[in-house]
Amino acid sequence: NSVACGLSINITSLRHAITILGRRQLQRWLQLLIFTTPKGGMQGVNPLLQLAATRGRVMELIAERVVPRNREFADHSFMVGIMSLMPALLGMQMADILDQLPVAQRVKQALLDYAGQHGLMLRLVEATEQPDPGALEEPLSHLSAINVDFLGACLTQGLAWANGLGQERGTAATD
């Protein structure tokens, strides 16, 4: 309700967003975003939103290995992954988007400058989307807890998670 009342607060994690918006409301909002009808009028998943969801989950899985048992770090990692495609989705510059959103400073720095561990992890996840496997070498060299096998497992789990959101679409409409 505080969002509806116009209160300005810093959202620091996905859990915090759930507390403020409510789990059901946040879930519906995310599903609406992920499964909006594309401009061509065809029903289906917006590929950029699906990629953003995949990035978020992969970042979260990597975070759990890089900084174990730190929920805040994992939540921030998820946010960085999800938000990393906002410029393409919204047609705006990242700096302009972040000026309008109350997010943690480390999230902003990762999204603007690839700073900190979140920035390194984002660089790694983006490298997995490149056709050149050599693109992984540089970011992997800075994340000693991550190897190619673990990264592959994270990518598989992240994609399965994002695809699972689409399968839940039908049941969300009847809730």
Locations of regions flagged by a protein language model:
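Conserved alpha-helical "signature site"
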Residues: 1-175
